[in-house]
Curated annotation (Swiss-Prot):
UniProt similarity note: Belongs to the universal ribosomal protein uL11 family.
Organism ancestry: Bacteria, Pseudomonadati, Pseudomonadota, Alphaproteobacteria, Hyphomicrobiales
UniProt-recorded name of the protein: Large ribosomal subunit protein uL11
Role according to the record: Forms part of the ribosomal stalk which helps the ribosome interact with GTP-bound translation factors.
Gene Ontology cellular component terms for the protein in this record: cytosolic large ribosomal subunit
Keywords from the UniProt entry: Methylation, Ribonucleoprotein, Ribosomal protein, RNA-binding, rRNA-binding
UniProt subunit comment: Part of the ribosomal stalk of the 50S ribosomal subunit. Interacts with L10 and the large rRNA to form the base of the stalk. L10 forms an elongated spine to which L12 dimers bind in a sequential fashion forming a multimeric L10(L12)X complex.
InterPro entries: Ribosomal_uL11, Ribosomal_uL11_bac-typ, Ribosomal_uL11_C, Ribosomal_uL11_C_sf, Ribosomal_uL11_N, Ribosomal_uL11_N_sf
Any one Gene Ontology BP term: translation
Gene3D superfamilies: Ribosomal protein L11, C-terminal domain, Ribosomal protein L11/L12, N-terminal domain
Pfam families on file: Ribosomal_L11, Ribosomal_L11_N
UniProt keyword rRNA-binding, yes or no: yes
GO MF entry, a single one: large ribosomal subunit rRNA binding
Originating organism: Nitrobacter hamburgensis (strain DSM 10229 / NCIMB 13809 / X14)
Length: 142
């Protein structure tokens, strides 16, 4: 018989840096989950990732206080900032340009994010990435 799901918890945790301090500890502790068990399992699964890459994670909480978690790909903004070699996006997107990304970089990001996006083709994913780039104040060059 399947376990009864009591809730979901979405967090964004740096790769290989999960520890019981806030925000992870209190979020898991309030729901009665074993914080160290999550931290060890998450850090073990993110060993091959670049250190401190933000990893979105969805934790499924069961009635017996056990849990499973699913890791997503890093946020699109993270990939765009890396590609443009900038620290943050533009304060006034549309007016000020924060940097520039090429179509090849956009395609690469779209292919990495494909499994988490709600689209079927790489071209559709590319248009989503381009939209995110524009909203960050990045220009998409040919």
């Amino acid at each position: 018989m399947a376990k009864k799901v009591t809730g979901y918890l979405k967090l964004q945790v740096p790769a290989g840096a999960a520890n019981p301090s806030p925000p992870i500890g209190p979020a898991l502790g309030q729901r009665g989950l074993n914080i160290m068990e999550f931290c060890k399992a998450f850090n073990a699964q993110t060993q091959k990732e670049e250190k401190n890459t933000p990893i979105p994670v969805v934790i499924t909480i069961y009635a017996d206080r056990s849990f499973t978690f699913e890791m997503k790909t890093p946020p699109m903004a993270y990939f765009l900032k890396q590609a443009a070699k900038i620290q943050s996006g533009s304060k006034a997107p549309g007016r000020d340009s924060a940097g520039q990304v090429t179509k090849a970089q956009v395609r690469e990001i779209a292919e990495k994010k494909m499994k988490d996006l709600n689209c079927d083709t790489v071209e559709a994913a590319m248009s989503m990435v381009e939209g995110s780039a524009r909203s960050m104040g990045l220009q998409v060059a040919e």
